[in-house]
Structure formats: structure tokens, C-alpha cells
């Protein structure tokens, strides 16, 4: 299930380390599911509500929580592709997610 909408109480308090990446999707499996109808990848950009994202509905039936993307962004989202931030329902453009910004820089 997607981390944001897993059934409450089904799992004990989980640390981020226990979250797996959501299902692969898109051409050649190069994308990751970010929500039931969202498939994104660095090389692909994002597919929303298209055939490439159909597989992402399967994630709703898996019991363990997942979260795709490395860097948090926006309101409860993760960087999904260059310049794009997605949560499990939608995506927005996000300069923080541009290439080269994917890893927090240590001062």
C-alpha cells in the first residue's frame, strides 16, 4: 500500500528504514509508482492516469507500506523526476527536485 494511505493500525509505528520502494512501472520498468495512478522515473518524467501507470493500482492490495523517491518535497511528497514532486494523488513542479538537487548538500 502507499505509505500515505495504508490502513491505520495495520502496522506498528514504522521507521522510514522499513519502507520499501513502491512497484516498478513504465517503459522497461524504469519508473516507480508514486500513487495508484502515478508512475515516475528520472529518465521518463511522470505518467498520470495512463497505461504506464496501470500497474500502480496493484500497490493498493499489497500489505506492506511503500514510498518511492528519495528526497521529501512539497506537502507530503517526494521528488519523483527532474523538477517534479509527487505525493500519492498528484504532482507539482518543484525546483528543489531538479537534477543535481536530489541529494541534500552538507555545508
Curated annotation (Swiss-Prot):
GO biological process terms on file: vasoconstriction
Recorded GO CC terms: extracellular space; secretory granule
Entry-annotated residues carrying Glycine amide: 9
UniProt keyword Disulfide bond, yes or no: yes
InterPro entries in the cross-refs: Neurhyp_horm (IPR000981), Neurhyp_horm_dom_sf (IPR036387), Neurohypophysial_hormone_CS (IPR022423)
Membrane spanning stretches: none
Chief location bin: secreted
A GO term for molecular function: neurohypophyseal hormone activity
Site label Important for agonist activity on V1aR/AVPR1A, positions: 9
Keyword Secreted in annotation: yes
Alphabetical UniProt keywords: Amidation, Cleavage on pair of basic residues, Disulfide bond, Hormone, Secreted, Vasoactive, Vasoconstrictor
Cysteine disulfide partners in this protein: 1-6, 22-66, 25-39, 33-56, 40-46, 73-85, 79-97, 86-91
Localization: Secreted
Family to which this protein belongs: Belongs to the vasopressin/oxytocin family.
Complex formation: Interacts with vasopressin receptors V1bR/AVPR1B (Ki=85 pM), V1aR/AVPR1A (Ki=0.6 nM) and V2R/AVPR2 (Ki=4.9 nM). Interacts with oxytocin receptor (OXTR) (Ki=110 nM).
The protein's role, per its UniProt record: Neurophysin 2 specifically binds vasopressin. Vasopressin has a direct antidiuretic action on the kidney, it also causes vasoconstriction of the peripheral vessels. Acts by binding to vasopressin receptors (V1bR/AVPR1B, V1aR/AVPR1A, and V2R/AVPR2).
More details: X's have been placed at positions 10-12 by homology with the complete sequence of the bovine precursor.
Protein name (database record): Vasopressin-neurophysin 2
Amino acid at each position: 500500500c502507499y505509505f500515505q494511505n495504508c490502513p491505520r493500525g495495520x502496522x506498528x509505528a514504522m521507521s522510514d528504514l522499513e519502507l520499501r520502494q513502491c512497484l516498478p512501472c513504465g517503459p522497461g520498468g524504469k519508473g516507480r509508482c508514486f500513487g495508484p495512478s502515478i508512475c515516475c522515473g528520472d529518465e521518463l518524467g511522470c505518467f498520470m492516469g495512463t497505461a504506464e501507470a496501470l500497474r500502480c493500482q496493484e500497490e493498493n492490495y499489497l500489505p506492506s507500506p511503500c514510498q518511492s523517491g528519495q528526497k521529501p518535497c512539497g506537502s507530503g511528497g517526494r521528488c519523483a523526476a527532474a523538477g517534479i514532486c509527487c505525493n500519492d494523488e498528484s504532482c507539482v513542479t518543484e525546483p528543489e527536485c531538479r537534477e543535481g538537487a536530489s541529494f541534500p548538500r552538507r555545508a
